[in-house]
Regions:
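Short polar catalytic/cofactor-binding loops
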Residues: 12-16
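Short hydrophobic beta-strand segments
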Residues: 7-11
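Glycine-rich phosphate- or other oxyanion-binding loops that anchor nucleotides, phosphorylated ligands
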Residues: 18-191
Length: 191
């Protein structure tokens, strides 16, 4: 068992914070704020200061196809804002699996889901690609990929899009903290 310095575990709002208690890891927490720009900026600053071995994004997400309380381990990311410009040849997808594998992280985390990220909080059903939707993960994956730092995102489904999403998100933050804490401290216990 190796000693490692995770150092960056990101979350958007205080209500999503859940402590990770892994004996073989030093964890540094970064509250990035909501949205792609804030998430990218605050993560880049933290990376510059602490040079982490891996970045784990933890938080809530909406869904169309799954149920509240489900937890997804995301390795594939879509920027739904850039996806609209795909016809112009712009990239809008990232997969972080190769770097995780190359650096030896999350080998026993067999789950693999897709997170769809955009600048708006989705409240109405729309045609989106992916298992969950959020407002930060793609931007963080982009920053990490650019700096060759492994990245993974763990999302707790707090709301089903189109079913009073904003209200459900606010009401489910405590459940999300409990679910994410159980995921990291009981189910996974290490990276």
């Amino acid at each position: 068992q190796r000693q490692m310095c995770i150092r960056d575990r990101t979350y958007a709002v205080q209500g999503e914070f859940a402590e990770i208690k892994w004996p073989d890891a030093e964890v540094y927490y970064v509250r990035t704020g909501i949205g792609k720009v804030k998430a990218a900026f605050h993560l880049a600053e933290a990376i510059r200061q602490v040079e982490p071995d891996i970045v784990i994004n933890m938080g809530t997400a909406g869904t169309i196809h799954h149920k509240v309380g489900d937890i997804f381990v995301c390795r594939h990311f879509i920027d739904r804002d850039m996806q609209k410009l795909a016809g112009l040849g712009l990239s809008y997808q990232l997969d972080t699996s190769a770097l995780l594998e190359q650096k030896g992280f999350c080998k026993h985390w067999t789950e693999s889901a897709t997170c769809n990220t955009g600048d708006s909080f989705l409240t109405e059903l729309t045609d989106i690609e992916g298992d969950v939707v959020d407002m930060e993960a793609y931007a963080q994956a982009f920053v990490c990929n650019s700096k060759e730092i492994p990245f993974i995102s763990v999302k707790y489904v707090s709301d089903v899009i189109g079913q009073n999403s904003v209200k459900h998100w606010e009401d489910k933050l405590a459940d999300a903290r409990t679910g994410l804490s159980h995921f990291f401290n009981v189910l996974k216990e290490s990276i």
